[in-house]
Each structure stands twice: as structure tokens, then as C-alpha cells.
Regions:
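Extended redox/cofactor-interaction regions of prokaryotic respiratory oxidoreductases
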Residues: 1-38, 42, 46-90, 103, ...
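Conserved strand-helix element at the start of the C-terminal RecA-like helicase core
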Residues: 97
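A glycine-rich, charged low-complexity "G-patch/RS-like" nucleic-acid-interacting patch
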Residues: 92-94
């Protein structure tokens, strides 16, 4: 049941056109901003029904004019099963079920979500935390990858990217995080673009802070 866009799975456009979207183990406003914006747009423009299985109604759910199925942590499996045949929620082949990473900690919950999708015809999508990391990989943000996730060592990939960019792409991999820190401290690099990174989460927090201070532009 779990499918990606290439196999006819869930896209942003599908979220906007769905009659009902069920959220389980997921708070879009906090964990998946693009999904939240699409659902808010759909609820306002089309009247899409957003149903959240959660312990409480979040501010994000209120912004989507959503409906809460109040569920104590650990009881999600029973709550999901209760949606079968429940006319008030209108879950059918026009619906989408979005499952967050937290649901994996609840015994039987993922199976229940798959069962709900199979019996109603609804589409099911898994939304892991930090889902944007996959987008960064596809954009070539790892030192040994080019856009599209193709290796820098792949000569054909370098030719393709070079043709699009109008440059000769070197075969030498870029710097990883530790390499960037070292280059900033040595003066080899002068500028730094940083986002969503806590120095305390790096291999050497003190060196990372020193590198940020050493950069001429951040």
C-alpha cells in the first residue's frame, strides 16, 4: 500500500484534491511545513477534511480547520481501526492517510494504517522526520554526490551536469562537515552557509564555533 510518486503514490497535488486526509503520528506544521501549507490551502479552498489521531488538538490542526480524534499515546492502533466504516470521517478511495515516524513506536499501528488503506482504497504515505534531507541528497548536497543523487566519480554524470550548468565539473569530491570546519579555520574558505545545525551536534563543537567565528561571511 505504501507507494511513492513514481508508482502512483501521494503528491502535493493529491493532498490538495483529497476529500479527507488522516494524520497519524504526524504534526505537519512542526514536522513537514510544505504538507501543512498544502493542507491548510485545501481546507480553505476546497473544504478538505483533515482528521488527526493525536492526544490533543494542535494549533496547526486548528489552522487547517481539522477534526481531532483524541487518542492517548499508545492507543493509536485502536483509533485507526475505529475509522473503518465510520461515515462521519468519509474515508474512501478519495482519501489520503499520512503516517508520521512516531507511529512506528506503537505496536500494530503501522499494520492498522496499512489495513485501513487496503480496505478503504485510500492512499498511504510515510512522512519521516527531516524528510527534507532526502531533497538535499537529490540536490547534491553531499560531498560525493551531484544533483540527482549521482556520484561525482561518475564521468557521464559529470558531463550531464556540466552541460546543464555550462561548466566543467571536477571529479574531486567536495568537503564534508569536518572538512568545511577545517577549511574555515585555516582561511581556505571565507564564507559559510549554515542552517538547522547546532554546533553541539557536530563532532567537535568547539572547533565548529571557532570556524563560524573565523568566517568572513555567514
Amino acid at each position: 500500500v505504501l507507494r511513492g510518486p513514481g508508482a502512483g503514490g501521494v503528491t502535493y497535488a493529491d493532498l490538495e484534491s483529497a476529500a479527507t486526509v488522516v494524520l497519524v503520528g504526524l504534526e505537519p506544521e512542526d514536522e513537514a511545513g510544505m504538507i501543512f501549507l498544502r493542507l491548510r490551502k485545501a481546507s480553505r479552498a476546497r473544504g478538505t477534511r483533515v482528521v488527526s489521531i493525536a492526544p490533543y488538538a494542535s494549533r496547526g490542526l486548528a489552522k487547517m480547520s481539522g477534526q481531532l480524534i483524541r487518542t492517548a499515546p499508545g492507543d493509536e492502533t485502536a483509533a485507526i481501526d475505529s475509522l473503518l466504516g465510520h461515515a462521519d470521517y468519509g474515508i474512501d478511495a478519495t482519501s489520503v492517510i499520512l503516517v508520521g515516524e512516531r507511529l512506528a513506536t506503537v505496536p500494530g499501528a503501522l499494520t492498522a494504517a496499512a489495513r485501513l488503506a487496503a480496505k478503504t482504497g485510500a492512499r498511504l504515505a510515510w512522512v519521516p522526520r527531516r524528510a527534507g534531507d532526502r531533497g538535499a541528497v537529490e540536490a547534491g548536497c553531499l560531498p560525493n554526490l551531484l544533483p540527482g543523487g549521482r556520484p561525482v566519480a561518475d564521468a557521464a554524470a559529470r558531463v550531464d551536469v556540466g552541460a546543464d550548468w555550462g561548466v566543467d565539473v571536477p571529479e574531486t569530491p567536495g568537503r564534508d562537515a569536518d572538512g568545511i570546519v577545517a577549511a574555515l579555520r585555516s582561511g581556505e574558505l571565507g564564507g559559510l552557509v549554515i542552517g538547522g545545525v547546532d554546533p553541539d551536534d557536530t563532532t567537535d563543537p568547539a572547533a565548529t564555533r571557532a570556524a563560524i567565528e573565523a568566517a568572513s561571511f555567514v
